[in-house]
């Protein structure tokens, strides 16, 4: 950041001094009087494409981008095909899956921008794209987690309260999704509003009399004070992580308990309790594994920022943060497998649709063959009747002129069936009647 008079330069990247007493890297700040310089040259640092850790993370992010975008588009296409073919209305489960796939698709769209930012080491797209990037990434990830909570409630209501049909109606699902979207937006509104492309001066040096050269970059980050950011992080941790996690655990625990009770009461029950239990456990654990490290690392980073030894962060922590930051993206990139590809209702509809399509094709083929057979029999009977009535005429007079240039001719006689044909005599060498 710069003013008209002075620039405070964070020289911690290129000119760090070691404090011998506590063994910590101290940040050097240099003050320049900008009135002394007529020329100020701003340069960019070299990119990070030669850093192996950055390259590995960039490749990982790109793989998540391909997996998430292709997978979510495949789920949406399958649902569209099933609904269009069967001409059925959307139920609550498919509505949840559609909205979840759309939100996760938006989250995955932010990954290429993140990769570019990692490789370059700075933000190059300006302030407005920075805010849009924050909306797609942060708002999408939080809303995705809230939708997973709503889906767990939907399954809980279907098993534990089947008599309350309103809880699983389409209108109720749409209302819940709208409420969650507003909730996520209000929760993240201060953060999204404070995101901006912030200027940071890494290094500055007087390269000639009256000339100052600065290494200046932009970073897409929040522009609020430390205490406000700490309070907001804790508040977001409680509302956007702890609350959904507790609700998901509660709903799935109640669901499994109800199914276990049902299988014990009805020994001949056909409910695949073990399969449902493993699937539910996989869904809950996947959510926990993707989001818990992210929030723990975020809280730890806030603690380090507010502690006295904040400059003692080892470089390896930065790469660990990059890896942990990829976990919520992993959640969005794989949700379509757990909630779309493995969705029993969607699979059943898809198989039923394919089966109906196959039956329609078989029925159409059989109907066509039967129609052709009837037409053949009809033609045969018609020929027989005509030939039978014309037999005496053909015997007495082998040919009969129909028009000026046409004659009716007879061929062979086999079992009283006389094949007849009309020949255009203009095609013959002479106009004499000819038996074919």
UniProtKB/Swiss-Prot annotation:
Biological role: Putative receptor.
Subcellular location: Cell membrane
Cytoplasmic membrane side: 75-94, 154-171, 252-281, 338-436
Keywords from the UniProt entry: Cell membrane, G-protein coupled receptor, Glycoprotein, Membrane, Receptor, Transducer, Transmembrane, Transmembrane helix
Organism lineage: Eukaryota, Metazoa, Ecdysozoa, Nematoda, Chromadorea
Annotated Gene Ontology cellular component terms: neuron projection; plasma membrane
Keyword Amino-acid biosynthesis annotated: no
Molecular function as annotated in GO: G protein-coupled receptor activity
Annotated transmembrane regions: 54-74, 95-115, 133-153, 172-192, 231-251, 282-302, 317-337
InterPro entries named among the record's database cross-references: GPCR_Rhodpsn, GPCR_Rhodpsn_7TM
Protein name: Probable G-protein coupled receptor C06G4.5
Annotated glycosylation sites: 15, 309
Pfam families the record matches: 7tm_1
Extracellular side: 1-53, 116-132, 193-230, 303-316
């Amino acid at each position: 950041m710069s003013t008209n008079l002075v620039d405070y330069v964070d020289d911690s990247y290129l000119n760090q001094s070691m404090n011998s007493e506590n063994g910590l890297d101290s940040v050097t700040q240099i003050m320049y009087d900008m009135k002394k310089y007529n020329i100020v040259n701003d340069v960019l640092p070299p990119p990070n494409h030669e850093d192996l850790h950055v390259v590995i993370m960039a490749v990982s992010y790109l793989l998540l981008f391909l997996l998430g975008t292709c997978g979510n588009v495949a789920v949406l296409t399958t649902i569209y095909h099933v609904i269009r073919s069967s001409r059925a209305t959307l139920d609550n489960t498919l509505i949840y899956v559609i909205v979840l796939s759309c939100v996760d698709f938006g989250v995955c769209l932010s990954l290429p921008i993140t990769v570019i930012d990692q490789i370059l080491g700075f933000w190059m797209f300006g302030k407005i794209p920075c805010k849009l990037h924050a909306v797609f990434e942060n708002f999408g990830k939080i809303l995705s987690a809230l939708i997973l909570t709503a889906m767990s409630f939907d399954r809980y209501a279907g098993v534990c309260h089947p008599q309350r049909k309103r809880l699983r109606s389409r209108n109720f699902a749409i209302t819940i999704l709208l409420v969650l979207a507003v909730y996520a937006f209000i929760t993240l509104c201060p953060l999204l509003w404070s995101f901006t492309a912030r200027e940071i001066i890494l290094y500055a040096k007087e390269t000639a009399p009256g000339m100052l050269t600065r290494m200046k970059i932009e970073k897409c980050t929040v522009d609020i004070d430390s205490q406000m950011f700490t309070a907001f992080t804790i508040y977001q941790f409680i509302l956007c992580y702890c609350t959904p996690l507790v609700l998901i655990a509660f709903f799935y625990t109640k669901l499994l308990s109800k199914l276990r009770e049902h299988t014990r009461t009805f020994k001949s029950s056909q409910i695949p309790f073990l399969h449902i239990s493993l699937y539910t456990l996989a869904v809950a654990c996947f959510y926990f594994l993707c989001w818990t490290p992210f929030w723990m690392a975020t809280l730890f980073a806030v603690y380090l920022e507010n502690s006295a030894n904040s400059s003692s962060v080892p470089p390896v922590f930065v790469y660990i943060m990059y890896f942990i930051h990829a976990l919520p993206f992993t959640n969005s990139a794989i949700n379509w497998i757990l909630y779309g590809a493995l969705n029993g209702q969607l699979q059943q509809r898809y198989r039923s649709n394919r089966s109906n399509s196959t039956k329609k094709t078989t029925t159409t083929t059989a109907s066509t063959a039967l129609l052709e057979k009837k037409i053949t029999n009809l033609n045969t009977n018609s020929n027989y009747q005509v030939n039978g009535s014309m037999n005496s005429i053909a015997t007495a007079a082998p040919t009969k002129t129909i028009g000026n240039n046409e004659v009716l001719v007879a061929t062979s006689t086999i079992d009283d069936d006389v094949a007849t044909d009309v020949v255009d005599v203009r095609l013959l060498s002479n106009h004499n009647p000819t038996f074919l």
